[in-house]
UniProtKB/Swiss-Prot annotation:
Gene3D superfamilies: Collagenase (Catalytic Domain), Neutral endopeptidase , domain2. This is Endothelin-converting enzyme-like 1. Binds 1 zinc ion. InterPro entries: MetalloPept_cat_dom_sf, Peptidase_M13, Peptidase_M13_C, Peptidase_M13_dom_2, Peptidase_M13_N. Residues 83-775 are lumenal. It is found in: Membrane.
Length: 775
């Protein structure tokens, strides 16, 4: 999901909404007369009754007809009032005090009001206006790097999951449910984990050949016995540790109906290549902390010559960092330029110092031909890796590969290893104390038993009714995008037709995959052994089984309805190579979505996230894929050129934002910024469509904002968040999202309807005269 922001408001400019409640005066006698009922005419008719005997028959008939017509008008007026002035579906209805709808409206009003800072002008700094109250009242918990409104939803989901795991039974049942509970208990059994100490890892290291080529010096005979490919097989094919490069089974970007082996740059421990280059004070500190971490872990494992090993391993990673292309680079955003499909025979010529057929045969348990095709996403990188292998001593390469396995698994060891990891995280991100054990174990259960845990979650915390309502909300927002495509003046007819087709074919997954309702189907996802006293072995069993499932895909038919994340995930995503949007049950929770909240808040909350993911299909990344999820340029050159010019405006806008003296990278964050802006507009216009169809909503109690204003406030309050200063450095360096503050400011300031809703003067910070717009 996403990140933080600020704003300002003159409250005397806000328009209060007046409404007549059917729960008000006269309610005890039944529904009160709706506004517009001709009371005066009724009294006149009644008062004239004494003169009736003197009227002739024609006059009486005429009067009767008028009375009948008046009655019809009254009935029609009542029906219209029920539709437009009475309670709407969002829940403001004719109900007694204390009914669920009223409670939900009151709860929503309290949440919004507590988060606001009414002293700030929304036309100056909307983020600070919308989130100032929240920022004042909340601190970052000691064991967290960030904390925000969405994180609070995560805490609620975590507590629910913990309670489900603590139960001896319950839920849909099945072997997978028993296994995830046993796994969770094994993770909590710190006494047993401490008793074992480093032994589980020492067994893994021995399986990889030990340190220093089994403890021998590099000399004739020993070097000849060493085989890089065998160790790569252990690292990648047994322990799932990316070393030198990554090997994955993925959809073929140019033919998404089949799976393909994909090879890409990888093998660094730190999250960004520039951290190895020590180009500023922050990266120097992080690199020094990483070196200390390496030495400490090596010492805990009883290795010899710890300082020398750490230095040599670090030098290998620094060499890899120097040949790695930054994710900020244009090359890494242009999939077509990266994509290089080659045969195994061709791959062998590109990187002659690796035995590819042998390596892939071992991992996939296949007998590949030299004509088997793989996709190489980093051709230049792999050529340089081959040179690095040739020029690096075997002993050093061996220790690097073993280290990559150690790093992947060290978080599952005894407290001294976990303390070393925490100290590194403390220097990198500023966390004050380690996460409590129960949270750590819940995270591991999510990672290794995601769907089993998800089956428990949706069984109790997400209904079929909620799923249907969100699906309708998605369809409303898709409809608006369809309309928007017809209105864009920069898109020609040919490109517009392809864009419409992509929208029509887009798959939408909401809540959970249907197979979770079938215990037998869930069990098949976890056919490996789990025991309460063998946590580390449980981890290894899970990793090996996951590798087995992955390698089997290479000959399987593609099922594009599969989910990348489990339903309890607090996230949403769009996959361009499937043309698929997914909104898990974990994010469809209050306060992002509540079926009893006003629709202004639902459209401003989850609606803007739905619009965000939908827009990803047409940003600088997703726009490279067609309606079937294939990497295909479906734009005309004229339309694409105009798209790039409009996108450049957004790049310049975000390039001008700074956080802690770090400049936001407008190009690196472009796709997310396009999605934020587009999502806000789509959700807003979808809400206007909803109002036209259902009538205006009742105002929230004790809040004087219109529902258009509440829509924008809800959007901003999605991103109320605090970050530790150290984590902001890494966020700007590595995150494709702009800091949350600017996600809000950048989006609302470029949307004409925001300025109109808050009556912002032209050229005020939130309503500049010149605006950027793509979708």
């Amino acid at each position: 999901m996403e990140p933080p922001y600020s704003l300002t408001a003159h409250y005397d400019e806000f328009q209060e909404v007046k409404y007549v409640s059917r729960c008000g005066a006269g309610g005890a006698r039944g529904a009160s007369l709706p506004p517009g009922f001709p009371l005066g005419a009724a009294r006149s008719a009644t008062g004239a009754r004494s003169g009736l005997p003197r009227w002739n028959r024609r006059e009486v008939c005429l009067l009767s007809g008028l009375v009948f017509a008046a009655g019809l008008c009254a009935i029609l007026a009542a029906m219209l009032a029920l539709k437009y002035l009475g309670p709407v579906a969002a829940g403001g209805g004719a109900c007694p005090e204390g009914c669920p709808e009223r409670k939900a409206f009151a709860r929503a009003a309290r949440f919004l009001a507590a988060n606001l800072d009414a002293s700030i002008d929304p036309c100056q700094d909307f983020y600070s206006f919308a989130c100032g109250g929240w920022l004042r009242r909340h601190a970052i918990p000691d064991d967290k790097l960030t904390y925000g409104t969405i994180a609070a939803i995560g805490e609620q989901n975590e507590e629910r999951l913990r309670r489900l795991l603590a139960r001896p039974g319950g839920g849909p049942g099945g072997a997978a449910q028993r296994k995830v509970r046993a796994f969770f208990r094994s993770c909590l059994d710190m006494r047993e984990i401490e008793r074992l100490g480093p032994r589980p890892m020492l067994e893994v290291i021995e399986d990889c050949g030990g340190w220093d080529l089994g403890g021998a010096e590099e000399r004739p005979g020993v070097a000849a016995r060493w085989d890089l490919n065998r160790l790569l097989y252990k690292a990648q094919g047994v322990y799932s540790a990316a070393a030198l490069f990554s090997l994955t089974v993925s959809l073929d970007d140019r033919n998404s109906s089949r799976y393909v082996i994909r090879i890409d740059q990888d093998g660094l421990t730190l999250p960004e290549r520039t951290l190895y280059l020590a180009q500023d004070e922050d990266s120097e500190k992080i690199l020094a902390a990483y070196r200390v971490f390496m030495e400490r872990v090596l010492s805990l494992l009883g290795a010899d010559a710890v300082e020398q090993k750490a230095q040599e391993i670090l030098q290998v990673e620094q060499q890899l960092a120097n040949i790695t292309v930054s994710e900020h680079d244009d090359l890494r955003r242009d999939v077509s330029s990266m994509y290089n499909k080659v045969t195994l025979g061709q791959l062998q010529k590109i990187t002659p110092h690796l035995r590819w057929k042998w390596l892939l045969d071992q991992i996939f348990q296949e007998d590949f031909s030299e004509e088997e095709e793989v996709v190489l996403l980093a051709t230049d990188y792999m050529q340089q890796v081959s040179q690095l292998i040739r020029s690096t001593p075997h002993r050093v390469l061996h220790n690097y590969l073993v280290w990559r396995v150690v790093v992947v698994l060290s978080e599952h060891l005894s407290p001294p290893f976990r303390e070393a990891l925490h100290e590194l995280a403390q220097e990198m991100e500023g966390s004050d104390k380690p996460q409590e054990l129960a949270r750590v174990c819940l995270g591991q259960a999510n990672r290794h038993f995601g769907m089993a845990l998800g089956a428990l979650f949706v069984h109790e915390h997400f209904s079929a009714a909620s799923k249907a309502k969100v699906q309708q909300l998605v369809e409303d927002i898709k409809y608006i995008l369809g309309q928007r495509l017809e209105e864009l003046d920069w898109m020609d007819a040919e490109t517009r037709a392809a864009a419409r087709a992509k929208l029509q074919y887009m798959m939408v997954m909401v809540g959970y995959p249907d197979f979770l309702l079938k215990p037998d189907a869930v069990d098949k996802e976890y056919e490996f052994e789990v025991h309460e006293k063998t946590y580390f072995k449980n981890i290894l069993n899970s990793i090996r089984f996951s590798i087995q499932l992955s390698v089997k895909k290479i000959r399987q038919e593609v099922d594009k309805s599969t989910w990348l994340l489990p339903p309890q995930a607090l996230n949403a995503y769009y996959l361009p190579n499937k043309n698929q949007m997914v909104f898990p049950a974990g994010i469809l929770q209050p306060t992002l979505y509540d079926p009893d909240f006003p629709q202004s808040l639902n459209y401003g909350g989850i609606g803007t996230i739905i619009g965000h993911e939908l827009t990803h299909g047409y940003d600088d990344w997703g726009g490279q894929y067609d309606r079937s999820g294939n990497l295909l340029h479906w734009w005309t050159e004229a339309s694409y050129s105009r798209f790039l010019r409009k996108a450049e405006c957004i790049v310049r806008l975000y390039d001008n934002f700074t956080v802690y003296n770090q400049r936001v990278n407008g190009k690196h964050t472009l796709g997310e910024n396009i999605a934020d802006m587009g999502g806000l507009k789509l959700a807003y216009h979808a809400y206007q469509k909803w109002v036209r169809e259902h009538g205006p909503e009742h105002p929230l109690p004790r809040l004087k904002y219109t529902h258009d204003q509440l829509f924008f406030i809800a959007f901003a309050q999605n991103w109320c968040i605090k970050r530790r200063s150290q984590s902001i450095y890494l966020q700007v360096l590595t995150d494709k999202h702009a800091p949350e503050h600017y996600r809000v400011l950048g989006s609302v300031s470029q949307f004409e309807e925001f300025g109109r809703a808050f009556h912002c003067p032209k050229d005020s910070p939130m309503n500049p005269a010149h605006k950027c717009s793509v979708w």
